Amino acid sequence: MKELFTLGDLYVSDFLKEDESPRHLPTELKLLLDDNGAVRLEKQPPLDTMWGRYWYRSGTNLTMRKELSDIVSSITNILKLKDNELWIDIAANDGTLLSYVPSNLIKIGIDPADDSFKKESEKHADLIIQNYFNADEFKKSK
């Protein structure tokens, strides 16, 4: 690996309440070039510092709702899914994409964000897994 440059010590995105101090220390973001030509971070910040508290909701923006609806339409036109097949939405957010998935499919949403999304996304899914996506977590949910 070859070091490209560092962006320095930066705070990872966090959505602070008024008069609240940052919950985490800054993290150095150093970029490396691997043998395949891919740019990578030297160290990944802890995931929960990036995704534990996340404010953006897909359903509040007409442009995003249209985009997500079009994604579902494109996929269902290509794949011709059968009854009870699984549709898994990784980073399901507030469940907006799942709201466009046909009801004859089993809809599973996975997202690590705090409880602020779960109530909304549960309206559109058969199951919401509030964690990071991995095979073990998925198997536990069956």
Task: Identify the role of each PLM range.
Residues 1-62:
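N-terminal juxtadomain amphipathic helix
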Residues 65-84:
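Conserved alpha-helix/loop element of class I SAM-dependent methyltransferases that forms part
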Residues 82-93:
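Conserved class I S-adenosyl-L-methionine
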Residues 94-104:
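Conserved SAM-binding loop of SAM-dependent methyltransferases across substrates and taxa
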Residues 106-111:
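Conserved SAM-binding motif I beta-strand of class I
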Residues 113-115:
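Conserved SAM/SAH-binding beta-strand->alpha-helix loop
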Residues 122-138:
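Conserved SAM-binding strand-loop segment of SAM-dependent methyltransferases
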